[in-house]
Design a protein with these regions (language model features):
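Conserved N-terminal beta-strand and adjoining loop/helix that marks the start
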Residues: 1-18, 84
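Short secondary-structure boundary/capping segments
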Residues: 2, 10-11, 75-78, 96-98, ...
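Conserved hydrophobic "DFG−1" position in protein kinase catalytic cores
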Residues: 12-13, 20, 88, 107
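Conserved Nudix-box catalytic region and its N-terminal flanking loop in Nudix hydrolases
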Residues: 14-52, 56
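Nudix hydrolase/Nudix homology domain
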Residues: 27-29, 95-134
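Hydrophobic pocket-lining residues within nucleotide cofactor-binding pockets
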Residues: 36, 67, 90, 110-113
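A short coil-to-beta-strand element that immediately follows conserved catalytic motifs
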Residues: 57-66
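Active-site-adjacent beta-strand/loop module that shapes the phosphate/pyrophosphate-binding cleft
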Residues: 68-95, 106
Length: 134
């Protein structure tokens, strides 16, 4: 039987740039987010994860595309990962403090992501293809 997890996270875009994080274990940029806990909605997970990872609070604006992966992009372990994305904005953009294991929080230009200047997670590429990142 294949392991299965459901993940939810915010997509924060401002002035043509995407808010991303990089963890110690990763060699790519990714969106904040994480596993849905028992009795938690996808939206609640989204808000909790951003607070845990960068110390900020968000306002969820709309649901974006969902991506199903068959492999963990970090460990390459075969598993089913259901990634739910929500367009969101930070309530107070100045209150950003990375929390371990987050080693970097950055704004990446969508144009540079499209031109593959950065190594990013599969869901960022997917959201670009779906037209969700504008």
């Amino acid at each position: 039987m294949v392991d299965e997890i459901i993940v939810s996270g915010p997509v924060i875009i401002k002035q043509g740039k995407l808010r991303v994080i990089k963890e110690d274990k990763d060699d790519f940029y990714k969106l904040p987010g994480g596993r849905v806990e028992k009795d938690e909605t996808l939206e609640e997970t989204c808000a909790r994860e951003i607070k845990e990872e960068i110390g900020g609070e968000i306002i969820i604006l709309e649901k974006l595309s969902t991506l199903i992966l068959s492999e963990n992009p970090t460990t390459h372990k075969k598993m089913r990962i259901e990634l739910h994305h929500y367009l969101a904005e930070l309530k107070n953009p100045l209150e950003i403090n990375p929390i371990e294991p987050i080693k970097e929080i950055k704004w990446l230009s969508l144009d540079q992501i499209k031109r593959k200047k950065y190594v990013v997670s599969p869901n960022i590429r997917y959201l670009l293809e779906q037209g969700d990142l504008k």
